[in-house]
């Protein structure tokens, strides 16, 4: 059998026939590199996030967030004090009754409001998980609830009345279809109570329902760590870290890091909590310092010398990639360590603390209850459990 002749040459002698698959791939990559514009920069997840409505509307500095909460609290205090004044003017109160009102019908502080919001945000998570809703729906419900109480005060809208509404709206937002009647039945609520504050919730969210959660970056980092540290990480161990980080991310959504950091940064912070040495090594390998020095991170893995052509090509790719991102690993580590400390330092209030705050909140909104309680006390009736029955947390 003879080879097909092309211009006097065998097809076996042509470059396309003798070129290996790896060489072809390298040639295509080289062509792509040459075709890139001079100011080419790869778009990262952080870049995409910073063009989202979530970033524009719900990202704050620490001072901005504090100021927003103080303003919301101040408006509610003015509203409560006006109602208390109207109540006193409308009723002929005794001196003792006035003293009781002044002592117990006191508006909540900003810190007390935040504690109550955090307590009920945890309840949103527990209820949503009890309903076997997907992780993304649970995360969105938590986000909706906490954002709602940046715009509104617990002294004006009872947190309990908005819990099921946020979960149901999260189902719709994340395309998890369930009818309102089915949802109300599963949540042991009613159709009217689920829908009562839905428009108010939408209005408070500024009709911005798309959420960027840290779960997607977690999957990306899970794959990229295995690629960057190829042969140096145990897959079973990485699987365990992945599962634990998903839980940590859900816990992180109950903190203020969602207002200060991007989803990939939050993901890296949760990974840092699980294994700081692994994350440090990954970042320093992927984004080497600009001076070319690279600190070693202690580990149990043995590194084997690799001097073949494929290793050289991989190193070139990593170098090009890190130039495109222009990320300083030391600076990034500083940022995610700050995020990590906020996640770890956040402690939700206990049930007992939440009950005290809820009772105080109930009294300032319902001063007549205090007067009735005082009268029953003067008549020798038991009043110890009256508010607890009305204000179950």
UniProtKB/Swiss-Prot annotation:
SUPFAM superfamilies: Cyclin-like. CCL1 and KIN28 form the TFIIK complex, a component of TFIIH holo complex. Component of a complex consisting of KIN28, CCL1 and TFB3. Residues 1-19 have a biased composition (Polar residues). One of its GO terms (cellular component) is transcription factor TFIIH holo complex. Signal peptide: none annotated. This is Cyclin CCL1. Belongs to the cyclin family. Cyclin C subfamily. Keywords: Cyclin, Transcription, Transcription regulation. NCBIfam families: ccl1. Present with 8700 molecules/cell in log phase SD medium. One of its GO terms (molecular function) is cyclin-dependent protein serine/threonine kinase regulator activity. The gene is CCL1. Residues 1-45, 289-325 are annotated as: Disordered.
């Amino acid at each position: 059998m003879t080879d097909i002749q092309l211009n006097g040459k065998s097809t076996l002698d042509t470059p396309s026939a003798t070129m290996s698959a790896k060489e072809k791939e390298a040639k295509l990559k080289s062509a792509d590199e040459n075709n890139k514009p001079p100011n080419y920069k790869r778009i990262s997840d952080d870049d995409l996030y910073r063009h989202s409505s979530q970033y524009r509307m719900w990202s704050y500095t620490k001072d901005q967030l504090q100021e927003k909460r103080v303003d919301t609290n101040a408006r509610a205090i003015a509203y409560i004090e006006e109602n208390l004044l109207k109540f006193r003017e409308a009723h002929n109160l005794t001196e003792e009754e006035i003293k009781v009102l002044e002592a117990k019908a006191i508006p909540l502080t900003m810190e007390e409001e935040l504690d109550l919001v955090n307590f009920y945000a945890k309840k949103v998570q527990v209820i949503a998980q009890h309903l076997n809703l997907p992780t993304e729906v649970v995360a969105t419900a938590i986000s909706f609830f906490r954002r709602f109480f940046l715009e509104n005060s617990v002294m004006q809208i009872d947190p309990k009345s908005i819990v099921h509404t946020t979960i149901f709206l999260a189902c719709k937002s994340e395309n998890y279809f369930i009818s309102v009647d089915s949802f109300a039945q599963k949540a042991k609520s009613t159709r009217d109570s689920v829908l009562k504050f839905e428009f108010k919730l939408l209005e408070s969210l500024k009709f911005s329902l798309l959420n960027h959660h840290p779960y997607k970056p977690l999957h990306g980092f899970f794959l990229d760590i295995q690629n960057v540290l190829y042969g140096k990480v145990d897959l079973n161990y990485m699987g365990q870290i992945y599962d634990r980080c998903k839980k940590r991310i859900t816990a992180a959504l109950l903190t203020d890091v969602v207002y200060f950091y991007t989803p990939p940064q939050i993901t890296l912070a949760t990974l840092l909590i699980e294994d700081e040495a692994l994350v440090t090594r990954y970042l320093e390998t992927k984004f080497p310092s600009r001076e070319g020095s690279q600190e070693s991170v202690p580990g149990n893995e043995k590194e084997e010398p690799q001097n073949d052509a494929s290793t050289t090509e991989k190193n070139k790719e990593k170098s090009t990639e890190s130039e495109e991102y222009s990320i300083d690993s030391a600076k990034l580590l500083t940022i995610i360590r700050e995020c990590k400390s906020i996640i770890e330092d956040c402690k939700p209030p206990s049930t007992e603390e939440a009950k005290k705050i809820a009772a105080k909140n109930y009294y300032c909104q319902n001063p007549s209850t205090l007067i009735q309680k005082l009268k029953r006390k003067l008549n020798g009736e038991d009043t110890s459990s009256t508010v607890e029955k009305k204000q179950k947390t």
